[in-house]
């Protein structure tokens, strides 16, 4: 038997050689559509779609591996069957008379989703390894999960325009979901919008050469979100525990029959501007108030449950979005277009039911604070004389202010609300160039003002607590002698007061600029291709994630929130040939 580990640690190269994993998915999709014109302006149509997939997932741990050795080899097979049916039936009316244009739609929609997951695991494989479960002697576990989801909707909408200047629309839908109890499953949602194209007005014509387009937009409405759990309103039971030698059911989740739709009330004001028939600008301001906010609320452990899915309160999002598109240069042989977009959003919890605040993982949900506010001890740096990690105690005085006394014992430091992970601004910058038979385009993405928490820091930055685990390159900056000024404490074997304690030390900026994509293409001249009977020929190079500047580069800056051991996005290069006949 080959030795897989040193001091109970993995030999990752040999582990990859002897273990096995594969996943295979078969997917089929189909659509059937029928339409009939009842009259010239009245049309009825039906669309039925089916989306089916079957996934087979197998994982084998060899007896030669560290984990597999415990079981003398272990195999796990998982098969997942999914099917979604969707039916949409529409009645559409449209009519234009004079300068007036009217259209109306009524619809009835049904969605049904079935999910089945089958799982089995066995151990004790023979010497001549055949990795199928049939070659393992002893069962470990088996399980089956069945889930269903259904949604029924009644929809109606009306659109009106006059003289390509005035526009108005109204929509209404009534949705019923199996995820909610019969008393709360139906929700009514609607929206109203209007716009005015001022550039079509007679008094704007003198400015037409400069102000080629000007449009005001406004909308208000409410839509709904469903809980992620299919059975959140029902208490569920699991059979698996044994009592007196017989399997017995136990209540695994607590249901909430009062669970209802999460509702978003949104107001949007927009302005579209066209300049010189060359530059187009869209500016939007929005505010969205979420009521009956869906969240899992922590429960007292005496209840026997850790949390309860419920409608906990209200939250407000406010922001602006800007988009600019420009045809910078356009000649016979050369063109250059640019697109730039920017978004800014901030949110705040307005109200929480029962409690003014509660902790949810690494976040605190607190009235008056952003929804994704990190809640941790506050790191105070390193003592330059001893190399010990320092923390602010953050005890609240009689005025509610936090004290900032530095302590070396993390147990004496209280967690407080710290950073909001949401970026202040984010967006993209795109350019496209065409010169005769050459085309070049690239896309830059950017984000500033956001933060993330490195959940892997308790291993990579533990300052000696686990000496065999891999460490971050920041250890090169660690404190080594009295007088050293650094933010990385000394490395102490078995350290129990270091980075393995969660603190703001592991909060990092997600500021970055990234060359998201680049495409360079060459098109063969038409005269060459006509002789060969080819309509078009193009060779190209494309790349993604080619360059990144990041304020913190130890993991992907596009990952926000709580970041763990995740696979970063790939940097890809591709060469291709396109032929059209």
PLM segments and residue spans:
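Extracellular loop and loop/strand-boundary signature of outer-membrane beta-barrel proteins
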Residues: 15-20, 29, 33, 70-79, ...
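Outer-membrane beta-barrel transmembrane domain signature of Gram-negative proteins
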Residues: 23, 27, 68-167, 220, ...
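Outer-membrane beta-barrel signature, preferentially recognizing the C-terminal barrel domain
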Residues: 16-19, 28, 137-155, 241-280, ...
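Extracytoplasmic gating/loop element in the C-terminal half of outer-membrane beta-barrel translocons
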Residues: 138, 177, 447-538, 543
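Conserved small-residue
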Residues: 310, 329-421, 452, 461
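Surface-exposed extracellular loop regions of Gram-negative outer-membrane beta-barrel proteins
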Residues: 26-97, 101, 149-181, 185-200, ...
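C-terminal beta-signal and terminal closure region of outer-membrane beta-barrel proteins
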Residues: 232, 236, 312-317, 361-388, ...
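Surface-exposed loop/turn segments flanking beta-strands in extracellular/periplasmic regions
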Residues: 1-3, 7-14, 59-74, 114-142, ...
């Amino acid at each position: 038997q080959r030795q897989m580990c040193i001091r109970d640690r993995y030999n990752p190269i040999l582990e990859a050689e002897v273990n096995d994993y594969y996943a295979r998915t078969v997917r089929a999709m189909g659509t059937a559509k029928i339409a009939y014109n009842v009259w010239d302006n009245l049309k009825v149509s039906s669309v039925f779609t089916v989306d089916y997939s079957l996934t087979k997932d197998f994982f084998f741990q060899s007896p030669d591996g560290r984990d597999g050795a415990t079981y003398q080899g272990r195999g796990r097979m998982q098969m997942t069957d999914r099917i979604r049916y969707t039916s949409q039936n529409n009645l559409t009316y449209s009519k234009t008379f004079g300068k007036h244009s009217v259209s109306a739609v009524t619809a009835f929609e049904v969605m049904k989703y079935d999910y089945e997951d089958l799982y089995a695991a066995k151990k004790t494989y023979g010497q001549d390894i055949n990795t199928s479960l049939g070659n393992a002697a002893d069962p470990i576990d088996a399980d089956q999960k069945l889930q269903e989801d259904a949604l029924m909707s009644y929809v109606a909408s009306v659109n009106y325009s006059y003289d390509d200047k005035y526009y108005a629309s109204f929509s209404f839908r009534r949705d019923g979901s199996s995820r909610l109890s019969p008393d709360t499953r139906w929700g009514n949602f609607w929206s109203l919008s209007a716009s005015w194209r001022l550039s079509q007005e007679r008094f704007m014509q003198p400015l037409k050469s400069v102000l080629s387009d000007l449009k005001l937009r406004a909308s208000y409405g409410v839509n709904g979100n469903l809980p992620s759990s299919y059975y959140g309103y029902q208490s569920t039971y699991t059979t698996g525990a044994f009592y007196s030698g017989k399997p017995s059911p136990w209540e695994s989740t607590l249901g909430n029959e009062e669970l209802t739709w999460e509702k978003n009330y949104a107001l949007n004001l927009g302005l579209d501007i066209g300049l010189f028939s060359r530059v187009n600008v869209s500016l939007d301001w929005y505010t969205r108030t979420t009521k009956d906010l869906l969240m899992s609320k922590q429960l007292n452990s005496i209840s026997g449950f850790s949390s309860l899915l419920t409608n906990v309160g209200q939250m407000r999002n406010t922001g602006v979005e800007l988009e600019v598109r420009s045809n910078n240069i356009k000649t016979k042989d050369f063109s250059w277009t640019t697109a730039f977009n920017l978004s800014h959003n901030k949110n705040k919890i307005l109200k929480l039911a029962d409690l003014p605040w509660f902790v949810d993982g690494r976040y605190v949900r607190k009235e008056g604070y952003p929804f994704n506010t990190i809640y941790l001890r506050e790191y105070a740096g390193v003592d330059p004389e001893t190399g010990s990690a320092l923390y602010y105690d953050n005890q609240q005085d009689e005025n509610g202010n936090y004290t900032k006394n530095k302590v070396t014992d993390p147990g004496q430091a209280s967690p407080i609300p710290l950073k909001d992970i949401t970026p202040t601004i984010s967006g993209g910058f795109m350019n496209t160039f065409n010169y005769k038979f050459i085309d070049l385009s690239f896309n830059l993405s950017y984000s500033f003002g956001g933060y993330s928490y490195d959940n892997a820091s308790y291993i990579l930055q533990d300052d000696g607590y686990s000496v065999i685990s891999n460490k971050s390159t920041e250890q090169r900056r660690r404190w080594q002698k009295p007088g050293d000024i650094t933010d990385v404490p000394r490395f102490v074997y078995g350290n129990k007061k270091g980075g393995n304690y969660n603190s703001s030390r592991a909060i990092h900026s997600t500021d970055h600029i990234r060359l998201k994509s680049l495409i360079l293409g060459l098109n063969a001249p038409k005269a060459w291709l006509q002789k060969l009977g080819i309509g078009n020929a193009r060779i190209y190079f494309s790349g993604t994630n080619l360059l990144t500047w990041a304020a913190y580069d130890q993991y992907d800056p596009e990952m926000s929130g709580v970041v763990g051991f995740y696979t970063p996005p790939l940097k890809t290069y591709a060469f291709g040939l396109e032929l059209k006949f």
